[in-house]
Regions:
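Long amphipathic alpha-helical tracts in eukaryotic proteins
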Residues: 1-332, 406, 413, 418, ...
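Short coil/turn segments at secondary-structure boundaries
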Residues: 224-225, 267, 338-344, 391-395, ...
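Serine-dependent carboxylesterase/thioesterase catalytic core
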Residues: 330, 344-345, 388, 398, ...
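Conserved beta-strand elements of beta-rich interaction domains across eukaryotes
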Residues: 331-334, 383-388, 429-431, 439, ...
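Active-site catalytic motif of lipid deacylating hydrolases and related acyltransferases
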Residues: 332-422
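Short, proline-enriched alpha-helix->beta-strand connector loops that line the catalytic pocket
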Residues: 453-455, 509-514, 541-544
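Active-site-adjacent alpha-helix of alpha/beta-hydrolase-fold enzymes
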Residues: 520-552
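Post-His helix in hydrolase/transferase enzymes
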Residues: 558-575
């Protein structure tokens, strides 16, 4: 047990200076008596008669008692200690600092994931090492990237890494493919396809490190190369660039999947950074932090949230029992958050907007659904649509619905999806992925729980029978979908027809509940072309209600208000389908 004494300096007039030494000695002796008394009570050890306990305060003793309780062998006692610590809001600063300096990583992470924890529990990150002479963050990032293994990685990552290491800012900006749209904004990106991205080498290198961090062995190399400190330097440097900060948090979240790296992550101060980010009003920032902290919290979380899997609710430790899961799967060139924003075209594409939850939300599943159904775990997933823009540089199988569905299925199982009742909610091509995932799971005995626990699904403008998009020119098709996806979406696609036939038979056999929404308005493609991407006949699964809505393809999953029909009908379906499970 360590004890800490904090001495605060005060100014003194020269006239009073003669008694300063005596006064300081008196205060130090008083502090020592209090610390020894508190320690004696906590440790239940004999207390020397030469020290007095007259000055000890009850709340000082409580600090040490809670600290000891947080290290008990009993998990229930440890959890109770963290809960009590998180509810302490009227201590003196030094008492929070005692906990901050003396608690173990398990307690610190628990406090970071506790909604009401005082920020004074979290010490600032340790000072960063100085940059090498004549070096820069760009050069350090290049050096880190170059130190990562370049063998046994796929063609896409090889190509991306080599570009980041060899090209200049100007030549990188001239690469006008999809290289700059990891988790991009979909059709709005297509509208600006002719514009040159304003990006830097640092950002480009960072994108490559994100992809490397998905490989567990590469995370070890990132840590060994000082990556945790370098990423923290970049995080501080780009405080006003949310995209850079989110990519950095993606890397830390991926590294946190490896439990042997947890001590290094904690020592480098990332828990304090994530604790602050978790309280952010920016939903994306808070969700990235929540994923990282959940991966660090092995005390209460057994699931692991891999890259692209985000828990929207609950993001903190909670006593509320979770009885079912609701999953949100975006469409091709969509995103885990912006696809599910409230309809508001003027606000929607603002990168750094902070909004009043009662007036506007950048992610309605987190803001509205979590409040209406607190017993749900709400997950939104993101798959890497930008890979499909790397033209012939990437293996073709990475672009197929089959490949994407298997990859997502593996990630969702790691997150514990299938262990409790599930409803799947999808937009556009995301619905095809849901169908393919469930069919694949039905063929694997080890995934039988996922099938048995699937209660139903909601499809927002899913092209079950193909899309008219495939009828248009090659240039337009390329802007929206890569060639393989276009072929799979065409009305005469054998793969799409087989997927539809197999799923309908399977869904009827399992008696899944289904709700279909479909757009009735065309969508602007670029600046001059309007296209009805998923017509009514294509969105008809053949099972469940089919509801036409007077919106376009992008807005079919974006309710205008919480009282709007789109949201209320969605909420009604969820509550009715899970009624029995939520009552248990």
């Amino acid at each position: 047990m360590k004890s800490y004494i904090y001495v605060h300096t005060v100014s003194a007039d020269k006239v009073e200076s003669h008694g300063l030494v005596w006064q300081a000695r008196k205060e130090l002796h008083k502090a020592v008596r209090k610390v020894l008394a508190a320690s004696a009570r906590v440790l239940r050890s004999p207390f020397a008669d030469t020290f007095s306990t007259v000055d000890i305060e009850d709340h000082d003793c409580a600090v040490w008692l809670l600290l000891r309780k947080s290290r008990e062998d009993s998990k229930a006692a440890r959890l109770e200690a963290v809960r009590e610590l998180s509810e302490a809001h009227h201590w003196h600063d030094y008492q929070y600092r005692i906990i901050a300096q003396a608690c173990d990583p398990r307690t610190l992470i628990g406090l970071a994931r506790s909604k009401e924890s005082d920020r004074r529990f979290f010490l600032p990150p340790p000072p960063l090492p100085s940059l090498k002479e004549d070096s820069s963050t760009e050069e350090e990032l290049r050096h880190l990237l170059a130190s990562l293994p370049q063998t046994e990685i796929d063609e896409c990552l090889q190509y991306f890494t080599s570009l980041a290491l060899s090209e200049s800012s100007q030549s990188l900006a001239a690469q006008k493919g999809g290289l700059w749209c990891f988790g991009g904004n979909g059709l709005p990106y297509a509208e600006s396809f002719g514009e040159v991205p304003s990006a830097t080498v640092e950002m480009f290198c960072l994108e490559a490190v994100v992809k490397h961090s998905e490989i567990p062995s590469h995370c070890d190399h990132i840590e060994a190369g000082g990556g945790l400190q370098l990423l923290q330097r970049l995080y501080q440097l780009y405080k006003d660039c949310p995209k850079v900060q989110r990519n950095i948090m993606r890397i830390i979240g991926n590294m946190a999947l490896n439990e042997h790296l947890h001590p290094a992550i904690v020592r480098s101060g990332w828990v304090s950074i994530m604790a602050e980010a978790l309280k952010s009003y920016h939903i994306m920032e808070a969700s990235h932090a929540a994923r990282t902290l959940a991966n660090l919290d092995r005390e209460t979380v057994c699931e692991k949230y891999q890259d692209g899997v985000y828990v929207l609710h609950p993001q903190c430790r909670t006593s509320q029992p979770i009885k079912a899961d609701v999953l949100f799967i975006h469409g091709l060139m969509g995103a885990a958050f912006k696809t599910w924003r409230q309809h508001d075209s003027k606000r929607a594409l603002t990168e750094n907007v902070v909004v009043d939850e009662n007036r506007y939300t950048t992610c309605w599943p987190k803001t509205w659904l979590a409040k209406d159904c607190p017993a749900l775990r709400i997950i939104s997933v993101e798959y890497d649509t930008s890979l499909s823009d790397w033209r012939a540089r990437c293996p073709m199988e990475r672009k197929s619905i089959a490949f994407r569905s298997n990859e997502l299925l593996s990630k969702l199982r790691a997150a514990g999806v299938g262990d409790r009742p599930v409803i799947w909610i999808s937009h556009s091509m995301g619905g095809l992925l849901v169908k393919k995932m469930l069919l694949e799971a039905s063929r694997k005995p080890e995934l039988s729980a996922l099938i048995n626990n699937t209660r139903g699904m909601i499809f927002y403008s899913v092209p079950h029978h193909g899309s008219r998009l495939a009828e248009y020119s090659v240039n337009i098709r390329y802007l929206l979908f890569p060639s393989l996806e276009v072929k799979e979406l065409s009305k005469d696609s054998p793969a799409l027809k087989k997927l539809q036939d197999d799923f309908v038979e399977f869904a009827k056999d399992k008696n899944f509940q289904v709700l279909n929404f479909v757009e009735t308005q065309p969508t602007f493609i670029g600046r001059m072309i309007k296209l009805h991407i998923v017509p009514v006949e294509s969105a008809d699964l053949g099972i469940g209600d089919l509801i036409p809505v007077d919106v376009n393809h992008l807005d079919i999953c974006k309710p205008k208000t919480k009282d709007a029909f789109l949201y209320q009908r969605t909420l009604q379906f969820i509550c009715e389908t899970l009624a029995r499970d939520l009552k248990n």
